């Protein structure tokens, strides 16, 4: 047997130069030691093939997995690289930390612009349909019908995109004696439904990913489902007994209530410096039209003149009167400083421009917010946040968790003074999976309560002669939401809004166009249809509503039995297959919509043809590689 030194001196192996040297490794050279291994053996050098250049090596290679490697044989340099590894890992970590620190202020900036875009969206809807909303409120004969009042509350709140505005109009009408408290209660219920359309629109911005869209749409519609279910139960109860009217009247009579201060403008202090540069509105015009003051019908909602100390004080001047006041040199007023102050455009044109701009800003900020939240909430950070938000209190206080979430939702809504802003802000988090729908449900219920506390504080700022009726209306809003919570939250089996929202989310993730159809039906077509039927008289409404309600209850009952105990049903009723397909499936409508969109869409360019496949059998035979003159059972790595 040859010694290790004799094998090193054999003609098949030559010593390695100081730098360079090619080592052939592959299936045929599995026993060849690497230079790093040989450096650990004292008195040895690495195996190499200095006589084979790159061209010769390329000729001797074969396509069966052999790899050509270049090794650095200097152990000093290897040791230096080992010492420099921590430093090389530290630089990417510092860069990642710097990027995270930079993303936080950017995320706060986009969140600020997102809230401002919601404010501008509300202003745009008021410019486009504010006077129409005032005209709707003006007809007291319509509002005396409870169903018509409910629909009016929905449509007006959708038009002005602010339940606070619609509620303030109702309070003004009750205070002036144009509307009774009992007639205003259904309108309050309708405004509660209409305010939930904003976060549903926000959920549409996450339609790119089906999973995120399913969660976001379910989290947004849980608010709608709660409001609709509460109205379906409490509106007939109120029409039959008037319990909200009697409870609030007793509360107002039992307390010696004095006028207070205005509701604190906590969020507006931050957003108004930006939004007042875009648009300023005179909301008293809508209230005046609703209360029957026809002198302001031709006045613009765009505010022209403001007080110099506070650029919010509204004035009821048209543009022509404003220009004449400027020539008279009114020292107590100065011109407002916003983009549309001197445009001369009508309110509808300004409203449409502002609507388009606010929607673009809303979509841009929301998309960037979602992307940044995706990059920030990764790995352990997302897990920690999910555990903190979605974990219940330890037993036996598990039941307290939901009510604590309600308090948090009410507090946050009181701070931002808008349930739409709060629910729209948590909708992207629901879509990302940070907040579960089970946790978002009590947060949404708390936001419903929080927006009523703001209305109560605003009512306390009313004059003494109007305080009683204004405070009673605000309390009706509060007790309506409390009654809904008592119906649909304390007992887990009664939390139907969560199940309904999840079903809507699954259906919307499968058919994305269903979200737009849902918005049109629930907030426009169905309220308009019910409004038209109710205006024909209660006989027509009962004649149409009773069969429709019975059919709806029958379908719901059969669906529940089909999913839980189909054996109790006859075979033909265990599925809906006996009906035409369009009556129990959305696939036919989906095919029509898909064809329509494909006809309008531009054809996609064809991808270039793929290169021809080369199979292993078609490769040329491999050239045999040189072998080292080493015994098979004496590997250098085993010494």
Curated annotation (Swiss-Prot):
Topology, Cytoplasmic side: 1-103, 164-165, 371-412, 488-513, 562-639
What GO MF annotations does this protein's record show? identical protein binding; PDZ domain binding; protein-containing complex binding; sodium:phosphate symporter activity
Question: Which cystines does this chain contain?
Answer: 225-522, 306-336
Q: What would be the name of the gene that encodes this protein?
A: SLC34A1
Q: What protein family does this chain belong to?
A: Belongs to the SLC34A transporter family.
Query: Has UniProt tagged this entry with the keyword Zinc?
Result: no
Q: What is this protein called?
A: Sodium-dependent phosphate transport protein 2A
Q: How does activity depend on pH?
A: Optimum pH is 8.0.
Q: In which tissues is it expressed?
A: Kidney and lung.
Oligomeric state and interaction partners are given as: Interacts via its C-terminal region with NHERF4. Interacts with NHERF1. Interacts with TMEM174; regulates SLC34A1 internalization by PTH and FGF23.
Where are the Phosphoserine residues found in this chain?
A: 14, 34, 607, 625
Q: Which organism is it from?
A: Homo sapiens
Q: Which segments cross the bilayer?
A: 104-125, 146-163, 166-185, 348-370, 413-436, 467-487, 514-534, 540-561
Q: Which GO terms describe its biological process?
A: arsenate ion transmembrane transport; cellular response to metal ion; cellular response to parathyroid hormone stimulus; cellular response to phosphate starvation; cellular response to staurosporine; dentinogenesis; gentamycin metabolic process; glycoprotein metabolic process
Instruction: Give any Gene Ontology cellular component.
Output: vesicle
What residues bear Phosphothreonine in this entry? 508, 623
**Top-level taxon of origin:** Eukaryota
- List the Pfam families: Na_Pi_cotrans (PF02690)
